[in-house]
From Swiss-Prot:
Name the UniProt record assigns to this protein: Mitogen-activated protein kinase adapter protein MST50
Pfam families in alphabetical order: RA, SAM_2
Polar residues bias (residue ranges): 37-54, 256-265, 328-346
Biological process per Gene Ontology, one example term: signal transduction
Role description: Mitogen-activated protein kinase adapter protein; part of the MST11-MST7-PMK1 MAP kinase (MAPK) cascade that is essential for appressorium formation, penetration and invasive growth. Binds to the MAPKKK MST11 and the MAPKK MST7 to maintain the stability of the MST11-MST7 complex for the phosphorylation of the MAPK PMK1. Is also involved in the MPS1 and OSM1 MAPK pathways, and especially plays a role in the activation of MPS1 in response to cell wall stress. Its function differs in the 3 MAPK pathways.
Entry note about domains: The sterile alpha-motif (SAM), but not the Ras-association domain, is important for its interaction with MCK1 and responses to cell wall and oxidative stresses.
PANTHER family attached to this UniProt entry: LD13733P, SH3 AND MULTIPLE ANKYRIN REPEAT DOMAINS PROTEIN
Deleted gene: phenotype: Impairs the formation of appressoria and the ability to infect rice plants. Leads to reduced MAPK MPS1 activation under stress conditions. Affects OSM1 phosphorylation in response to hyperosmotic stress.
Subunit structure: Interacts with MST7 and MST11. Interacts with MCK1, MKK2 and HIK1.
Keywords of this entry: Virulence
SMART domains named among the record's database cross-references: RA, SAM
Organism: Pyricularia oryzae (strain 70-15 / ATCC MYA-4617 / FGSC 8958) (Rice blast fungus)
Region annotation Disordered: where it falls in the sequence: 1-56, 207-285, 309-379
């Protein structure tokens, strides 16, 4: 890299001319002016920094970065800018590239360069090389005063770069226009080629058939009919229970739940283990059943339309070996319609004063639709959420709470709490925890439910009863005058 011949440095020329003036008006010290070569030395044939009449082999700058120059390369650089008389001083002071980029006026003055113009020439030349090589300029480096305004004016190089960028832009736009014209022509040809094929496809399509006065749906009228009666339903029709289309005949006649097809349930389409009490219609059935028993005073006959004629054993009913010894017969009392809402047994022993003297009748269980019991781990909480009992409460605390919930004003020791799951049932002991047991069975998918049963004993001695007996041990053969109802809860 070399500088063009004839480059003028206005600062140095002005300083040289200014030094020739009177010393009194000059801001430069007299010692500097006396030591200046332009005043003290006789005229010589050597060139000045503005003439560059002498060109040596040092014209060419080193190809390395200025910060990596050696002392000899720095001396060659000083000779290149026309100040060859100071080259030996740079070699003597071992000024390398790192020191050259950080030189200031004071440093050059200490090296014996007393001319302000020569110092400005050296510093400005070093700054130009740093800018050309993209060497970072530190805050303590020399920066010319005119360098602050250099970026505000466009140079010939900037204009050349701008013209080149505009030329490249025009070439790209021309290429884009050619590509767009070619795509438009290809699309036009494709459209012309596809139009005949589209016309043929359109002509080949057949129109959809039209409906003539709904004749297409006439065949469905003959296919919709009630299902044929099955052998199981035909065999039971003589006994009072029959299956109809979308209805089910139950005990209470016409109720909102009776004619709903969603509550259709027979012995052959659902097992008896899933039959539980519907809480939404239990109260209504209990009131009507108790009124019916109180008025007639008789056991419902097998042909009564309000009760089924079949006597199907239930998983909640006691075995035949127990008979009537341990479990009392259920009844609905007309003076207590509310407690009877949870019972599913009916017998005339207590509905009529003379019923016990006539003949004992086995208790009959009414068919009730299965309620929507809550599933999951919170099923026990849903059932006993209003009982005010906790999961750890034993049976002798849960049993009084259940009786109080259903307004059964009877001693709690006259009742036993049974848990029914699947086709099995078990009497809970007084120390067992019903809710924990319910939760365990529900997790196993056995669909448990609780049931209250009245015992024959008047009082139960908790201290003498064995766990799991629920008062049945002392209730053998005992009689009581109070007979509240029991049932499924």
């Amino acid at each position: 890299m070399s500088f063009n011949t004839g480059t003028a440095y206005a600062e140095s020329d002005a300083d040289d001319e200014y030094e020739r003036d009177i010393h009194d008006s000059s801001p430069i010290d007299a010692t500097d002016a006396e030591a200046s070569p332009t005043e003290s030395d006789p005229p010589s044939n050597e060139h000045t920094p503005t003439t560059y009449g002498y060109r040596s082999s040092a014209d060419r700058l080193p190809e390395t970065i200025i910060s990596e120059w050696t002392a000899d390369e720095c001396a060659d650089f000083i000779a290149t800018i026309g100040l060859e008389q100071y080259s030996t001083r740079f070699v003597e002071n071992e000024i390398v590239g790192e020191a050259l980029v950080a030189l200031l006026h004071d440093d050059l003055k200490s090296m014996g360069i007393h001319s302000v113009g020569h110092r400005l020439t050296i510093l400005r030349s070093v700054y130009d090389v740093k800018k050309a090589q993209d060497v970072p300029v530190e805050s303590d480096h020399y920066v010319p005063l005119t360098a602050e305004n250099e970026g505000q004016y466009a140079t010939a190089k900037d204009i050349k770069n701008l013209v080149e960028q505009l030329r490249l832009r025009d070439e790209r736009m021309h290429l884009f226009e050619q590509d767009f014209r070619r795509l438009a022509e290809d699309f036009r040809r494709l459209r012309e080629d596809m139009l005949p094929a589209l016309r043929l496809a359109k002509d080949a399509q057949q129109p959809l058939p039209h409906l003539n006065n709904g004749s297409a749906y006439a065949g469905y009228d003959t296919t919709i009919s009630p299902p044929a009666p099955t052998p199981s339903t035909s065999g039971q029709s003589g006994g009072g229970l029959k299956r109809q289309w979308s209805t089910k005949k139950i005990m209470l006649g016409t109720t909102p739940k009776a004619t709903s097809p969603t509550h259709l349930q027979t012995a052959h389409d659902r097992s008896l283990a899933e039959q539980t009490l519907d809480p939404s219609s239990a109260a209504e059935r209990a009131v009507m059943s108790s009124s019916h028993l109180a008025i007639n005073g008789l056991v419902p006959s097998a042909t009564s339309p309000s009760y089924p004629s079949i006597n199907i054993p239930s998983p909640t009913s006691p075995p035949n070996t127990l008979g009537g010894a341990t479990l009392a017969s259920r009844s609905y009392r007309s003076d207590q319609p509310t407690p009877s809402s949870r019972s599913t047994f009916a017998e005339s022993d207590y509905a009529h004063p003379g019923g016990r003297d006539k003949q004992p009748v086995a208790p009959r269980r009414m068919q009730t639709p299965a309620p929507d019991t809550p599933s999951g781990s919170n099923a026990s909480v849903e059932i006993f959420k209003s009982f005010r009992v906790s999961m750890d409460d034993p049976c002798y605390k849960v049993l009084p709470a259940a009786l109080k919930k259903y307004q059964i004003n009877a001693p709690w020791d006259q009742y036993a709490l049974y848990i029914v799951y699947g086709d099995q049932e078990r009497c809970l002991g007084l120390e067992e925890k019903p809710l924990i047991l319910f939760k365990q069975l529900d997790k196993e998918g056995k669909k448990p439910m609780f049931m209250l049963r009245k015992t024959n004993n008047a009082q139960v001695d908790i201290g003498n009863e064995a766990p799991g007996s629920a008062g049945l041990g002392s209730a053998r053969g005992a009689a009581t005058g109070y007979d509240p109802p029991g049932g499924i809860i």
